[in-house]
């Protein structure tokens, strides 16, 4: 800029209350670019904007961020208040409270800020430029050009000094503002409505390598930052972050030309419960806000007194015309200051009255079923996200099955105040107390789920029952498509039947683009034209917005008392309970971490030729869907032909696979496990049976001498007693009758024994003692199945040989009507056929 402007001329400009160094340090309150952009988004939200457009522009090799909204806009006085650090005239229900977001957010992203706003037919521009201050050597103060003009471009000026200031401001903006190749008038034309605001940030922040701090090339419809947390997309993607930033998204947000589709935080939650918490003990935020409001009233009083002192007792008839114009301007300032004072007093009094009322809030809890690793506690203050997925509560570190369990809180600013960057809480002690209350509620909630809700839900919704020893969490996650209970990387399997149940349980939530209300449908076909960009209430009820009741709160109260649903007992009593079988098998066999279940593989259909007496025609196929687990010895194929046929024809066969739900949950049903482990054979082998000792009532012990005992018995018993006493070891005292009990066996020992029988039956070596072994049960069963198939094939070969023999006889009889064959009167059919075949071959020779 040519040095044709004196330093004194800059005194005509508006001046901020801080210096340039504070402006730089204040920008570091944000943890990253997404946090800074969110601050600017909050300003549009608080201005009741319906639409916000966030764009990245590259004009003449200059990069800019542009945010354009159709909110209330600002007059010149309101725009100047924006550069007063720490000032905020927003109501208590608004998101922004510190009056600092515009400056801190903008200068975290870049070094040049241009604001253009429109209200009441007046356009106002405001520029804060680092480059301008550095070029002019202005480091002690922040000078802010802030010209105003009407829709025709005519400046709003009352005096000659105001005109001079306007010209100077336009000159500085023309040189230092981040306009690119555009003019200020062209930029103002982009505000098409009667009100609105445009924020342009230039000279964007770069890394030490010269690259932009934001990535705009990875996704043309998004703004990406490198946070180093790939498993948390809301830390890297502006679009993902904005999907959850507001509980009630009243404003449409467009990022680089494409609308952000908000997500309802609990749309995929089940078991939605809430607990009411009193806020009486949280007073730090209230006291701080009250002090701020008292300070605002005091400043307004001082401002009014200052203006009144400038007016004094001047007589309008004794001054010049220009002085009278200045006096008129002062009178307007008095009116404005009085309005500000009245507004501040009314706001403070309303806040006091509201503070006397009882404060409470809800802890909303549920189980996330679609993205269960994206759980934790989500804190919102005044409808705005503060912390997402917080896991400071001990519940998440001490409770193994905490994955998927989530909670969100919608807090009021009068109880809790956010930090300046809205990435945490302002009062640490209050936050710690709040976390402890959340921890207690989550502990009660998980107990309720495990003891009551999950068993009832599985029975009523999925027709799945819980048996003694079953891991209810494993069964629950199994039916919802997760084969691992605690892994955060486990991916949910897709199932259309499960989707149908989810639609009924959770509903399908859509945000109306007209009234911005969440609408719930239970089936996809209830929604006509399901394009989210244009969805409105009319797509559901065909009558217009708000004609149906939206279920904004579908959480019920967490019961303090509830019925404990006891697990059912298993039908089998021949062995210890096989619940927790998966974990027990792992410990007994020291298997690898693959955690494969002992499932019987499903055997594919094979071709089988039955004899005429078997009820099947020659060449007819049959399907084998199950197979006995014990292999048929290779050296006894012929002796087992009838047995194999009997086993295939009867229903006494092992189920081809463990129940799908139990397989996903990580446990096998007791009946299936018993069949796999115990029912090795119907006739050839005896299953190992260990019966629990019968409980007997204790009897008083009689001390009977050996002689008397012999006298009380007959001769036969005497001989038996003599033989028994002759062989039994001598004891000093006999206190009671010895009871022969079955040897006790722990669950691990029993499972190991069953597993060894399983391996031995399939021709495998048993588990080594005090050793480890890795094996694949599915592969073992498949090998046995292949051997059984070979045995079946031998049957088929024998039948085919018989058919060939019969064919030879029939062919010969057809060619020779008369024959002199000697057909044996006795013998099997096979022997008779062989005899006739030998006779035929002898005649041929």
Curated annotation (Swiss-Prot):
Residues 284-311 form a coiled coil. Expressed in germline and somatic cells. Residues 637-646 have a biased composition (Basic and acidic residues). Disruption phenotype: Mortal germline (Mrt) phenotype in which there is a progressive decline in fertility with each generation at 25 degrees Celsius culminating in complete sterility after five to six generations. Resistant to nuclear RNAi and defective RNAi inheritance. Reduced trimethylation of 'Lys-9' of histone H3 at endogenous siRNA-directed targets, a small degree of irregularly localized heterochromatin, with 70% correctly localized, defective chromatin compaction in hermaphrodite X chromosomes. It catalyses: ATP + H2O = ADP + phosphate + H(+). Its EC number is 3.6.1.-. Pfam families: HATPase_c_3. Its main location: nucleus. Residues 574-590 have a biased composition (Low complexity). It comes from the Eukaryota. It is an enzyme of class 3 (hydrolase). PANTHER family: MORC FAMILY CW-TYPE ZINC FINGER 2 (PTHR23337:SF3), ZINC FINGER CW-TYPE COILED-COIL DOMAIN PROTEIN 1 (PTHR23337). This is ATPase morc-1. It comes from Caenorhabditis elegans.
């Amino acid at each position: 800029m040519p040095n044709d402007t004196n330093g004194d001329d800059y005194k005509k400009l508006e001046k901020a209350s801080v210096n340039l160094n504070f402006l730089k340090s204040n920008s570091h309150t944000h943890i990253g670019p997404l946090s800074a952009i969110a601050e600017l988004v909050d300003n549009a939200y608080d201005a009741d904007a319906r639409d916000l457009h966030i764009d990245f522009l590259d004009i003449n090799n200059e990069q800019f961020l542009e945010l354009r909204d159709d909110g209330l806009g600002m007059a010149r006085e309101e725009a100047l208040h924006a550069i007063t650090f720490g000032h905020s005239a927003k109501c208590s229900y608004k998101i922004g409270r510190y009056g600092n977001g515009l400056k801190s957010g903008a200068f975290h992203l870049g070094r040049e800020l241009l604001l253009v706003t429109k209200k009441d037919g007046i356009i106002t521009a405001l520029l804060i430029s680092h480059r301008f201050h550095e070029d002019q050597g202005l480091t002690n103060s922040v000078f802010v050009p802030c010209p105003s003009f009407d829709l025709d471009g005519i400046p709003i000026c009352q005096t000659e000094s105001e005109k001079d200031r306007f010209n100077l401001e336009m000159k500085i903006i023309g040189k230092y503002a981040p306009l690119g190749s555009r003019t200020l008038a062209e930029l103002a034309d982009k505000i098409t409505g009667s009100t609105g605001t445009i924020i342009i940030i230039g000279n964007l922040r770069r890394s030490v390598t010269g690259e932009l701090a934001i990535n705009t090339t990875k996704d043309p419809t998004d703004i990406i930052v490198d946070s180093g947390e790939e498993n948390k997309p809301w830390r890297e993607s502006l679009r993902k972050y904005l999907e959850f930033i507001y509980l009630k998204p009243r404003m449409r947000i467009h990022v680089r030309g494409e609308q952000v589709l908000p997500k309802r935080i609990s749309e995929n939650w089940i078991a939605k419960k809430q607990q009411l918490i009193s806020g009486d003990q949280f007073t730090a935020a209230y006291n701080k806000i009250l002090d701020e409001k008292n300070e605002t009233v005091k400043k307004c009083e001082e401002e009014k007194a200052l203006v009144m002192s400038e007016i004094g007792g001047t007589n309008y008839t004794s001054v010049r015309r220009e002085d009278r114009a200045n006096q008129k301007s002062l009178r307007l300032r008095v009116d404005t200051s009085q309005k500000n004072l009245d507004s501040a007093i009314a706001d403070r009094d309303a806040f006091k009255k509201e503070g006397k009322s009882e404060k409470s809030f809800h802890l909303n809890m549920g189980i996330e079923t679609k993205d269960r690793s994206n759980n934790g506690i989500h804190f919102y203050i005044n409808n705005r996200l503060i912390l997402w997925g917080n896991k400071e509560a001990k519940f998440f570190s001490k409770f193994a099955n905490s994955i998927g369990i989530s909670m969100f809180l919608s807090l009021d600013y009068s109880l809790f105040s956010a930090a300046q960057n809205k990435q945490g809480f302002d009062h640490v002690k209050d936050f710690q107390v709040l976390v402890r209350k959340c921890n207690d509620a989550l502990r009660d909630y998980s107990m309720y789920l495990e003891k009551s809700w999950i068993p009832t839900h599985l029975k009523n919704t999925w027709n799945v029952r819980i048996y003694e020893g079953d891991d209810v969490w494993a069964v629950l996650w199994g039916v919802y498509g997760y084969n691992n209970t605690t892994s955060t990387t486990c991916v949910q399997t897709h199932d259309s039947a499960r989707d149908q149940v989810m639609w009924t349980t959770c509903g399908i939530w859509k945000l109306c683009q007209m009234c911005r209300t969440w609408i719930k449908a239970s089936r996809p076909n209830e929604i006509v034209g399901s394009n989210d960009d244009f969805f409105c209430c009319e797509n559901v009820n065909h009558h217009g917005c708000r004609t149906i009741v939206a279920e904004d709160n579908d959480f019920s109260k967490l019961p303090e008392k509830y019925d404990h649903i006891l697990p059912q007992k298993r039908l089998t009593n021949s062995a210890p309970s096989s619940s927790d079988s998966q974990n027990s098998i792992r410990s007994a066999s020291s298997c690898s971490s693959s955690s494969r279940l002992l499932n019987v593989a499903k055997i594919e259909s094979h071709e089988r030729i039955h004899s005429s007496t078997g009820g099947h025609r020659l060449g007819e196929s049959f399907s084998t869907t199950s197979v006995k687990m014990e292999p048929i010895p290779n050296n006894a194929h012929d002796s087992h032909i009838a047995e194999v046929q009997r086993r295939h024809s009867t229903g006494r066969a092992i189920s081809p696979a463990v129940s799908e739900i139990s397989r996903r949950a990580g446990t096998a049903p007791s009946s299936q496990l018993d069949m796999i482990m115990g029912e090795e054979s119907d006739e050839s082998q005896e299953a190992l049976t260990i019966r629990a000792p019968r409980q007997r009532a204790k009897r008083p012990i009689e001390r009977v001498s050996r002689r008397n005992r012999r006298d009380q018995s007959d001769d036969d018993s005497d001989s038996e007693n003599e033989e028994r006493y002759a062989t039994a070891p001598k004891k000093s005292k006999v206190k009671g009758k010895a009871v022969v009990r079955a040897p006790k066996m722990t669950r691990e020992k029993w499972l190991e024994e069953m597993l060894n029988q399983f391996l031995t039956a399939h021709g495998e070596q048993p588990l080594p003692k005090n050793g480890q072994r890795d094996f694949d049960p599915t592969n073992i069963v498949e090998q046995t199945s292949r051997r059984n198939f070979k045995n079946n094939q031998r049957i088929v070969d024998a039948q085919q040989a018989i058919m060939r023999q019969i064919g030879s006889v029939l062919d010969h009889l057809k060619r020779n009507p008369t024959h002199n064959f000697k057909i044996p009167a006795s013998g099997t059919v096979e022997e008779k056929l062989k005899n006739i075949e030998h006779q035929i071959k002898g005649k041929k020779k």
